[in-house]
Structures are given as C-alpha cells and as structure tokens.
C-alpha cells in the first residue's frame, strides 16, 4: 500500500476524547499536496469542519489537525490511523485541550463509487 492508495472519501464514526465517550459521525476526504503529504478535510455532523496535514509510512497514517469552535477558539490535535486496508482505517486521536485521561477513537470506511460496486 502507498500513500496514493489512501486518496479518497471515507465515512467516519467515532467517539470523543471525554469520559462520556460521546459519539459522532461524518465524512473524511483525503488528498495529496505537491509533496505527497496527506491533506485531510473532515466534515463532522452538519456544521463542524476540521482540516489537517499528515504523512504515511508502513501502514500508519499520522495527521496533525485543527478546527475553530463557534466561540473562535482554535483546537489542535493529532490522529493516528492504522491502515488495515486501503479502504478501512482504524484510529485514535487526542486534542491539546481534551481530557488527558482519555483518547478519542475513529474508524473510517472508504465510500465506493457506484460503478466500483458493480464491477
């Protein structure tokens, strides 16, 4: 598997970095920049957008991400995915302002084009 194999759109679900393990879902889009680094764009629920840049090696994808809250606070963190296949990513993450005793968890499943499903 190469970094190029990870480019695409994924359905995500996970739980937050809190004791309640509150759940979330959304979409993750992975693309490459001119240096073959991963560019990530998450759409969480209906109204939260997060972005990040990362790198891939030996089936591990690491992305430094950030987003802005409704109150204007910038949150930063890192997510680490184990690339089980080019279609399934299993990850965990942490934010600098999150509960230090907890980790967030996220799974990503590639969204296939209809024509891919028929072949």
Regions found by a protein language model. Name each.
Residues 1-119:
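Central antiparallel beta-sheet cores of small beta-barrel/beta-sandwich binding domains
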């Amino acid at each position: 598997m190469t970094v190029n194999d990870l480019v695409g759109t994924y359905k995500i679900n996970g739980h937050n970095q809190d004791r309640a393990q509150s759940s979330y879902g959304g979409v993750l889009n992975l693309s490459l920049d001119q240096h073959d680094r991963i560019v990530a764009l998450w759409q969480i629920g209906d109204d939260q957008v997060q972005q990040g840049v990362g790198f891939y090696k030996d089936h591990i994808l690491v992305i430094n991400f950030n987003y802005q809250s409704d109150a204007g606070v910038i949150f930063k963190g890192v997510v680490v995915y184990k690339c089980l296949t080019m279609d399934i990513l299993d990850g965990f993450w942490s934010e600098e302002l999150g509960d230090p005793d907890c980790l967030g968890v996220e799974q990503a499943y590639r969204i296939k084009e209809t024509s891919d499903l028929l072949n």
